[in-house]
Amino acid sequence: MLVWLAEHLVKYYSGFNVFSYLTFRAIVSLLTALFISLWMGPRLIAHLQKLSFGQVVRNDGPESHFSKRGTPTMGGIMILTSIVVSVLLWAYPSNPYVWCVLFVLVGYGAVGFVDDYRKVVRKDTKGLIARWKYFWMSLIALTVAFALYITGKGTPATELVVPFFKDVMPQLGIFYVLLAYFVIVGTGNAVNLTDGLDGLAIMPTVLVAGGFALVAWATGNMNFASYLHIPYLRHAGELVIVCTAIVGAGLGFLWFNTYPAQVFMGDVGSLALGGALGIIAVLLRQEFLLVIMGGVFVVETLSVILQVGSFKLRGQRIFRMAPIHHHYELKGWPEPRVIVRFWVISLMLVLIGLATLKVR
């Protein structure tokens, strides 16, 4: 929005030309989202406390979690608000990729909001009925997937980028829709499963978003895309603004979510952030890269799948509790140790993922 205004004002003062620089807008997008979230934090927390929107804790969870009961939840509202406002201010409104991310972000945020509302108001730990949650998540994912397929079929926008192989980029055809669906829905749920400890989900999200900001910049630059042997996508550059907004909003939220947390993001935050990372990976054609950089989310999800599968097939559990971060808690690891070690692993995976762009 401000970019368009600056384009009209540049004729009166050349200094407004700085708004056309992607790097400048990326930095101010991060700072805008950061300051909004820091400003909203105390106010939202106080309001949630006034409404008694406190966290509902499972009775079969680790005993250390019982002290979290009543901590304000639905803090994801401040994350979403910060991201949306920052993106609308600093990204080109005419860019379709930006609107795809906002559509999934807000859509999944709405699903998460309803889920959280049922938990905190009706005191129902299950929240929104699972089939309805997946119905709405699937509808949102399929809507954007079909739209992208119709507008991009037969172009690099629907190719599959395979790590380590620079000349292997097959056209997916209609399978693009299926892949996009699983990536968006899967990532939304993966981040949701990871959000079980103070700050555990938000920092990996920030790191992955930061990694995708670099990838988006390279993908939207013809010279760098050619150098890295990845598809050049002319709309991809503006995703840098979206990614840096996620980083800024995430860091602002972490200020209040770090151990011991003053607020939890709730499903309104985790589903939205996961869906956003998923659609960003789809738009950049970097689904495999998401698996690497978001390895913490992948492992958390696999631990649940393996735990449920093992119990149903063998009547035995693999882990003391799933997702796997609870397993380490029950082994006696202090919560901060689990959190920081997962952060370190996430940072390593993001760096490894970025390195694969060159190893081709």
Swiss-Prot record:
InterPro entries: Glycosyl_transferase_4, PNAcMuramoyl-5peptid_Trfase, PNAcMuramoyl-5peptid_Trfase_CS. Its main location: membrane. GO terms for biological process: cell division; cell wall organization; peptidoglycan biosynthetic process; regulation of cell shape. Pathway: Cell wall biogenesis; peptidoglycan biosynthesis. Keywords: Cell cycle, Cell division, Cell inner membrane, Cell membrane, Cell shape, Cell wall biogenesis/degradation, Magnesium, Membrane, Metal-binding, Peptidoglycan synthesis, Transferase, Transmembrane, Transmembrane helix. Its cofactor is Mg(2+). Its EC number is 2.7.8.13. The keyword Cytoplasm does not apply. It comes from the Bacteria. GO terms for molecular function: metal ion binding; phospho-N-acetylmuramoyl-pentapeptide-transferase activity; UDP-N-acetylmuramoyl-L-alanyl-D-glutamyl-meso-2,6-diaminopimelyl-D-alanyl-D-alanine:undecaprenyl-phosphate transferase activity. The keyword Ubl conjugation does not apply. PROSITE patterns: MRAY_1, MRAY_2. CDD domains: GT_MraY. Disulfide bonds: none annotated. It catalyses: UDP-N-acetyl-alpha-D-muramoyl-L-alanyl-gamma-D-glutamyl-meso-2,6-diaminopimeloyl-D-alanyl-D-alanine + di-trans,octa-cis-undecaprenyl phosphate = di-trans,octa-cis-undecaprenyl diphospho-N-acetyl-alpha-D-muramoyl-L-alanyl-D-glutamyl-meso-2,6-diaminopimeloyl-D-alanyl-D-alanine + UMP. Pfam families: Glycos_transf_4, MraY_sig1. Catalyzes the initial step of the lipid cycle reactions in the biosynthesis of the cell wall peptidoglycan: transfers peptidoglycan precursor phospho-MurNAc-pentapeptide from UDP-MurNAc-pentapeptide onto the lipid carrier undecaprenyl phosphate, yielding undecaprenyl-pyrophosphoryl-MurNAc-pentapeptide, known as lipid I. Belongs to the glycosyltransferase 4 family. MraY subfamily. This is Phospho-N-acetylmuramoyl-pentapeptide-transferase. It comes from Cronobacter sakazakii (strain ATCC BAA-894) (Enterobacter sakazakii).
